[in-house]
Each structure stands twice: as structure tokens, then as C-alpha cells.
Amino acid sequence: MLADGYFTLSDGTRVGVAGDYVKANGVFQSFTSLCFRVPHELRFPDVSVLAELYSSGGSVVFVGPPSSGKTTALKSFASYLSERVDVVVADERHELSANNTADCDVIRGADKRYAFEVAVRSLSPQWVICDEVTNADLPYVCDCVNSGVNVACSVHGTSKEDIEKRFGDKFSCFTKAVILDKRHSVQVVDLQKSSTMTKSKEI
């Protein structure tokens, strides 16, 4: 983890690291600052949004800049889903499973390729939840969806147009996008119909 710029404490606190990185060895030679992201027992405020995402069917992507509430939304959605269906949480960075995922099957510390493969082949979920998907991860996400398993994940971004520009057709496997921002507004966008529902709620 440290070579990736962070490490995770036993309670789920993620500590980001800044300093002098030595590329050849893949380690930090010295540290200049640390950023602590302490997990809290928070819930996504509008259960009706979670209910809509579940009842409408299809995979969901939560989109927002850092600290916009993406991980909180995913945790709440995982908890909501786990009361209704079988859920696997692919927790690569040890953050998603810090709180309120007791009824989920959790794969911690594995990269998304391995976690998605194990989930589909061995755990029989209806949903897989993961955080911070990159362009390189999307083929594994789409393979999972094409296998008949819905996915809820997050990406860094600011709008539907932003993620479409950056990721193109790779996002075709998602049905809805939930756009979050630091002003605590929530937009649910139907990616198949381009319709938008806006809700202003504090996260």
C-alpha cells in the first residue's frame, strides 16, 4: 500500500502520504505530510435515491470530486442492498468495509481484477460494490455486468459529460449515474435516457 501513496489503519482510517518517492525502489525515502481520512458511521441521507437505484435495476456509478461523499454513498447503498440481495464488497483500499457492511461478503486488499473474478465465480452475488474505478478497471466491471451481476462503483469526476469524455463507450454497462458535489446536491442521471432527477440533500 505504501508504495501506492497510502496505508490503512486497523479501524479503516486511510492515511495518504506525501514525500520523496524513489521510483526505482517503489518506496518513499522521506515523508513530508500525512492526510488522515477517518471513517465515520454516516448514512446517505436520502433513502428514496437508494430505493430508486435498486428498483430500477442495472448498474450504478457514483461520480464526484474528492470528499464529495462517494464512499459514504457506496457504503449506504451496500447496506441497503444487503438487506435485500446477496452483495460482495470489493474493498481494495480497506475503506468500504470499515462500517455497516456486516451482511456483505467482503474481499479486502485484492485488486479489482481478482476481486471481481472471485466474486462472480465463487460467491454468487447479485451486486458487487467497489470504490474508485479507473480506466484500467472498467473491462473487469463490464465483464461482471455481462455475467449478469450488477455493479455499483465510484469514479472521480464532475458530471455525466466529464466521465463520457474520459471513458467513452466503456461506461455503456452502467444504467444510472449519481452525480455528487461538495455543495451536497445529488443528481441521478439515467444514462440510457439522459434524464436527470436533482435532489439537494446534505451528505
Regions found by a protein language model. Name each.
Residues M1-G57:
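P-loop NTP-binding catalytic core
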Residues S10, D20-Q29, L180-I203:
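Conserved P-loop NTPase
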Residues F62:
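Hydrophobic anchor at the beta1->P-loop junction of P-loop NTPases
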Residues P66:
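The conserved Walker
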Residues G69-K70:
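Conserved glycine(s) of the Walker
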Residues A73, F77:
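Hydrophobic positions on the alpha1 helix immediately C-terminal to the Walker A/P-loop
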Residues L81-A119:
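P-loop NTPase switch/communication element
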Residues P125, C130-L191:
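Conserved P-loop NTPase nucleotide-binding/switch module
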